[in-house]
C-alpha cells in the first residue's frame, strides 16, 4: 500500500502554527505523512565567490531555523515528516512538489500579499489553488 502524503507549506509566520495544527488533524485522519515545504528567497546571482557561498549558507541556515519548530511539532504528534527547503517562489513550486510526491492534499494558510505587488502577481494561495493537481485546504 502506498503511503498517503499531505503537502504542508509554511512561511514562518504565526499563522503557520495554525496550518501545522490543521495538518496534524488531517494527517491523522488520512494516516498520511507530511511533506513540509518552506520556500526561501532566491540565492543571489550577482555576488562573486566567496560572498555568494556565504549568502547561500546564511539563507539555508535561516530556512532550517524557520522550519525546525514545525518539524518538531509534527514529530511530537507522531506524524512522519519530510522537509523540503526550496529556492523557487512558493506559488510555482508547491504544485510541482505536490505532483512529484503524489500528494492527496495541500494545506496552506490564507495569508497573501497585501501590497501593490500582490495586485499584479496574485497571492501564493491563489496560485496554488489554480495550478495544483490535488485538493487544497486553506486555513484561516
Language model features: what each stretch is:
Residues 53-65:
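A short acidic, glycine-rich active-site loop
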Residues 35, 82, 137:
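Conserved beta-strand positions in the Rossmann-like core of class I SAM-dependent methyltransferases
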Residues 25, 96-140:
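Gly/Ser-rich helix-loop-strand patches that form or flank binding pockets
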Residues 44, 91-93, 115:
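Generic structural signal for helix capping and beta-alpha/helix-loop junctions
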Residues 1, 72-106:
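Structural beta-alpha unit
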Residues 31-33, 79, 103, 134:
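Short glycine/serine/threonine/alanine-rich loop segments
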Residues 2-50, 73, 77:
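Small/aliphatic-rich secondary-structure junction motif
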Amino acid at each position: 500500500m502506498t503511503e498517503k502524503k499531505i503537502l504542508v507549506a509554511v512561511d514562518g509566520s504565526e499563522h503557520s502554527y495554525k496550518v501545522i495544527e490543521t495538518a496534524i488533524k488531517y494527517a491523522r485522519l488520512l494516516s498520511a505523512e507530511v511533506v513540509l515545504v518552506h520556500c526561501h528567497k532566491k540565492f543571489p546571482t550577482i555576488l562573486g565567490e566567496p560572498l555568494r557561498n556565504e549568502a547561500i549558507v546564511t539563507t539555508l541556515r535561516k530556512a532550517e531555523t524557520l522550519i525546525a519548530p514545525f518539524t518538531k511539532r509534527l514529530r511530537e504528534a507522531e506524524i512522519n515528516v519530510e522537509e523540503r527547503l526550496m529556492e523557487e517562489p512558493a506559488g510555482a513550486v508547491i504544485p510541482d512538489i505536490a505532483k512529484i510526491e503524489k500528494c492527496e492534499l495541500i494545506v496552506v494558510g490564507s495569508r497573501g500579499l497585501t501590497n501593490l505587488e500582490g495586485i499584479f502577481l496574485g497571492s501564493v494561495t491563489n496560485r496554488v489553488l489554480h495550478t495544483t493537481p490535488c485538493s487544497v485546504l486553506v486555513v484561516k
